[in-house]
A protein has these predicted regions:
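C-terminal amphipathic alpha-helical interaction region
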Residues: 1-116
Length: 116
């Protein structure tokens, strides 16, 4: 018999591995950054829940849309690093969400496509 946390962590690990697999196919330069996101999820209690929430926000708002071809982010590794640097112990994720909004705005701006 396993604990509830074990089941939740198992589900998270499976998703993390899936994101690594997608990075290998879609943006190999981002593999190391995606692997390193695992260090965001650690500890117990509030710290653990906050790290997991921040991880899901970065994956859902940057990595997954990039891998799906919805977000034209050419340097996902740098975007993940920037988002991780903005992650603070804030349950509302204000700093992280602001940083992600800026990253997404830069990626979708006409100037971003002119540089390519």
């Amino acid at each position: 018999m396993f604990s509830i946390r074990y089941a939740q962590e198992r589900q998270w690990i499976e998703r993390w591995l899936h994101m690594i697999s997608r990075a290998m196919v879609k943006q190999p330069a981002a593999i190391e950054a995606v692997v390193a996101t695992a260090s965001m999820v650690q500890g117990y209690g509030d710290a653990y829940r906050q790290g997991l929430a921040d991880w899901h926000t970065i994956i859902n708002e940057l990595a997954k849309p990039t891998f799906d071809g919805v977000l034209p982010l050419t340097d996902l590794a740098s975007a993940i690093a920037e988002a991780r640097a903005a992650a603070m112990p804030d349950p509302r994720q204000a700093s992280l969400k602001r940083a992600i909004a800026q990253i997404r705005a830069r990626a979708t701006s006409p100037d971003a496509h002119a540089a390519e």
